[in-house]
Amino acid sequence: LTLAKFRAMRLLWARLLEVNGAAPANLRLHVETSFRMSASRDPHSNILRATAAVFGAGLGGADTIAVLPFSIAQGLPDRFARRIARNVQNILLAESNLWRVADAASGAGYVEHLTEALCEKAWRHFQRAMDGDWPQPDSTRAEGLPVIGTSAYLPPTEYPPAIEALR
């Protein structure tokens, strides 16, 4: 989904410029991993979450990515957590060569379908907003869904990370 969101953003940007008669312009897309996706009960699982998020954002066309340290939900991350956050990007960049392909997901049926569906839904929301009917967020959508490391598949023993200050 992350990958399709970023692809959709670029398509929507181009459409918005076209509809408004503006000249085509590049979209500079800077993203950051989400604090909300960080589990506080099993912080080490956040390393995997960050890796998946960076991978999706990179394949989706993000220009720059900031990775929050895995222990951010507990407090001020220590040097190790900050180092891991930097290394997530460095490893994906240097070892997977994500940067070598402009749109690696192009032609993948499911990704193309998901990107198109996101574009259509976002454009409808945008049109409604422009007509003064601002869409309201649906906070009930994710209620009850399990979160790995928080409400499902908890580690048998907690291994708290080192932090420099409490949150």
Positions of the model-derived regions?
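Short acidic/histidine-rich active-site segments
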Residues: G61-I72, L98-A105
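Helix-rich catalytic cores of soluble enzyme domains
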Residues: L1-A57, L68-Q89
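Short, glycine-/Ser/Thr-/acidic-enriched flexible segments
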Residues: S34-M37, A62, F70-I72, Y153-Y159, ...
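Catalytic-core signal marking the mid-to-C-terminal active-site face
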Residues: R83-R167
